[in-house]
């Protein structure tokens, strides 16, 4: 064995001698019966190459030290400095583009809780869709992820996941010929909601201009199924405009729901640039007015996005028109561009300004206003307040049924 080991080492001697001259990189050779040579046993010299400097390392070395950071006695940033948007170069080398970073107040955690997974599994099992997923809502981790399931909120999207309209702010799929309605959807929706044990639920839908009634009867049937299975659940319906057919609006308003919501989305002047050409601000105002007239005890609700280029005067005008038709609740949220194919963000509105408009809305007489960068029309904080108001009304009337609402048959002709 010793002879074979010495013979093998002699074969590697030439390689080691060449490595000393720097011609060939050193090669470590071991026989099957040899042990790892110790550092002192080898005379090979290793050549180390200097690591390439990077832009990040240069910036890090040039920046403040930890001692500087801890001992900094500079005054706090004022609001304008704290809210200043930062930019970054994004893209491959040689083709980088300057992009505005998302403000810190718009960043949310990635959803991955047990409650989130449970809700998602139930929805998939019953072939149901939610606007939370389809519209890429930033609040999904908050609304679905709470440990208290009674506080969880999932906005069910009826009549499929494909819309017949193409609003320039919305990421929901569009088609002129979406799939037919699922006749089992009202029953499946009611079953899922009763299974979750929620106290408040939001129903919405895609626009279905391909249907004669715009899907109003399907919507109303779903509400009635829910009330049959769980009369105590409070139901909010966020509907479309049914192409201006106010009889269909009245049908849904009288189906037994508690809150009728329809979004004007933006101020009147920007509506043609923001919404589909088949929608308009005055038509939305008429929808909200018809719902309130059909069932005066209903809470009516709408929502506006900020950051689209609206002016203060345009916002004042929108709020005045909403109060004229007795809209009870309004919400303000930041428009966030879903993809590069959609409208660009004109402005990231600061939290302070959202608070200013919340106070202005309350001063104008709105029952409630949820206003903030991440607030959406079905934001659960607003629902908690509305739920409390409705429960107080029920307690005052001594009933567990929807106060002042008489559910009508789906095929009943409204007058």
Curated annotation (Swiss-Prot):
One of its GO terms (molecular function) is lipoate synthase activity. Residues 146-367 form the Radical SAM core domain. One of its GO terms (cellular component) is mitochondrion. It is an enzyme of class 2 (transferase). CDD domains: Radical_SAM. It is found in: Mitochondrion. [4Fe-4S] cluster 2 binds at residues 163, 167, 170. Residues 30-50 are annotated as: Disordered. It catalyses: [[Fe-S] cluster scaffold protein carrying a second [4Fe-4S](2+) cluster] + N(6)-octanoyl-L-lysyl-[protein] + 2 oxidized [2Fe-2S]-[ferredoxin] + 2 S-adenosyl-L-methionine + 4 H(+) = [[Fe-S] cluster scaffold protein] + N(6)-[(R)-dihydrolipoyl]-L-lysyl-[protein] + 4 Fe(3+) + 2 hydrogen sulfide + 2 5'-deoxyadenosine + 2 L-methionine + 2 reduced [2Fe-2S]-[ferredoxin]. Binds 2 [4Fe-4S] clusters per subunit. One cluster is coordinated with 3 cysteines and an exchangeable S-adenosyl-L-methionine. Pfam families: LIAS_N, Radical_SAM. PROSITE patterns: RADICAL_SAM. Residues 1-32 form a transit peptide. Its EC number is 2.8.1.8. Pathway: Protein modification; protein lipoylation via endogenous pathway; protein N(6)-(lipoyl)lysine from octanoyl-[acyl-carrier-protein]: step 2/2. Its cofactor is [4Fe-4S] cluster. Belongs to the radical SAM superfamily. Lipoyl synthase family. HAMAP family: Lipoyl_synth. This is Lipoyl synthase, mitochondrial. It comes from Neosartorya fischeri (strain ATCC 1020 / DSM 3700 / CBS 544.65 / FGSC A1164 / JCM 1740 / NRRL 181 / WB 181) (Aspergillus fischerianus).
């Amino acid at each position: 064995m010793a002879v074979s080991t010495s013979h093998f080492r002699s074969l590697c001697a030439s390689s080691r001698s060449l490595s000393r001259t720097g011609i060939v990189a050193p090669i470590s050779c071991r026989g099957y019966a040899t042990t790892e040579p110790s550092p002192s046993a080898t005379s090979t010299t290793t050549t180390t190459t200097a690591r390439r400097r990077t832009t990040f390392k240069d910036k890090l070395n040039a920046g403040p030290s930890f001692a500087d950071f801890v001992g900094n006695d500079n005054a706090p940033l004022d609001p304008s400095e704290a809210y200043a948007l930062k930019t970054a170069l994004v893209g491959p080398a040689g083709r980088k583009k300057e992009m505005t970073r998302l403000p810190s107040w718009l960043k949310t955690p990635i959803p991955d809780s047990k409650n989130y997974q449970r809700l998602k599994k139930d929805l998939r099992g019953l072939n149901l869709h939610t606007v939370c997923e389809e519209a890429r809502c930033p609040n999904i981790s908050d609304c679905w992820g709470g440990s208290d399931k009674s506080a969880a909120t999932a906005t069910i999207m009826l009549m499929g996941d494909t819309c017949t309209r193409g609003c320039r702010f919305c990421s929901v799929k569009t088609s002129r010929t979406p799939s037919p309605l699922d006749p089992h959807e009202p029953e499946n929706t009611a079953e899922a909601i009763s299974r979750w044990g929620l106290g408040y639920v939001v129903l919405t839908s895609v626009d279905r201009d391909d249907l004669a009634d715009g899907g109003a009867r399907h919507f109303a049937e779903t509400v009635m199924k829910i009330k049959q299975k769980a009369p105590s659940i409070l139901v909010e319906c966020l509907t479309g405009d049914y192409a201006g057919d106010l009889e269909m609006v009245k049908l849904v308003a009288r189906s037994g729901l508690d809150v009728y919501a329809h979004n004007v989305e933006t101020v009147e002047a920007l509506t043609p640039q923001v919404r589909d050409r088949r929608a308009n601000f005055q038509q939305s105002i008429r929808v909200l007015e018809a719902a309130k007239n059909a069932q005066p005890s209903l809470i009516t609700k709408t929502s506006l996005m900020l950051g689209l280029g609206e002016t203060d005067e345009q916002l004042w005008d929108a709020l005045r028109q909403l109060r004229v038709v007795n809209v009870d609740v309004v919400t303000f949220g930041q428009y966030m561009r879903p993809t590069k194919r959609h409208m660009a963000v004109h402005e990231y509105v600061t939290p302070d300004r959202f608070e200013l408009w919340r106070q202005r809305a309350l001063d104008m007489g709105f029952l409630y206003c949820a206003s903030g960068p991440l607030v959406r029309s079905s934001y659960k904080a607003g629902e908690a307040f509305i739920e409390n108001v409705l429960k107080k009304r029920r307690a005052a009337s001594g009933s567990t049924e929807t106060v002042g609402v008489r559910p009508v048959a789906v095929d009943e002709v409204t007058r």
